[in-house]
Amino acid sequence: MKKHKKYICNNCDKTGHDSKSCPDPVTSWGIILVKFDNLGHLNIAHDKNTKLTNITEVKLEDALDINKASILIDRIQFLLISRKHSLGFIEFMMGRYSLMNMDHLSFLIRQMLPTEIKNIRDNINNFDKLWSGLWGKHHARYNNEYHNSKKLFEKINDVRSVDITLEFLLDNIVPSPIYKNPEYGFPKGRKNKGERGKECAIREFQEESGFDIEDIKIIEEVEPIIENLTGTNGIRYRHIYYLAELVSDKEIPLIKTEHQIYEIGSVNFYTFNDTQHHIRPYHIEKKNIVTKLFFYYMEKLMNLGKT
């Protein structure tokens, strides 16, 4: 009797389908790391099953609280990483556009950095150089996308295939890029086969930030934080983050691994205001998460030492 293969989805962990046909949002796992700058090692107590959805404000009862809050406001810092390449550039290089929809292609180009647009112009007839510059030695894992994207790239540069070539689009139609700086976010990524969510979050955090698991304390009492969004490609995404605190005196590691060199632009801690500035305006839910975490820790620090 022929046995039917039992599928276990690596995206949602449910049975009956694989990740390519999963109806759930494309899910990534990561860690939001909080640092208390110049406050020493704090022993902050957390209530079990804490949900950030219940946090909406910081209560300031008197002038002493206001003064304390003004001191603490820049002491709570969040670890952000910037990607080496913009999402617009990656989507373009992966061939996630249609020659029948120039408006969407123009939108992707506007999301790119000026340096990326210049790179395309300089290599308008050399897709392979653009591809290897994007993925380095990891290009083999994207072989399927490579062949499809290269065909699209060659077509959009061929006047016999399209009315508007990529070169003409770059030089005459697409307005200036919207952003001059890369996109910032938290360390995260998708699970490897057979990997659990928390394992994935820790691995991605270590690979992207350079910190080790011994440098941080994952706050188990706070429930994982969920960010839902829809990409410019119409695909639904879900980012699930564990909250963690920095417990070592380790400086921010230098970007030196092969993974970091090709994927990460920078790693740094930022104050609440700077974090809000670096996160792009359309990431409203991410900004709200940072705000709730800031309120949460302000309340915790304000109450330290109070009876």
Language-model segments: what does each one mean?
Residues 23-27, 72, 234-236:
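A short catalytic or substrate-binding loop motif that flags glycine-/basic-rich loops and adjacent residues
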Residues 29-35:
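Short beta-strand scaffold segments in enzyme catalytic cores
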Residues 83-85:
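Short beta->alpha transition motifs characteristic of CBS
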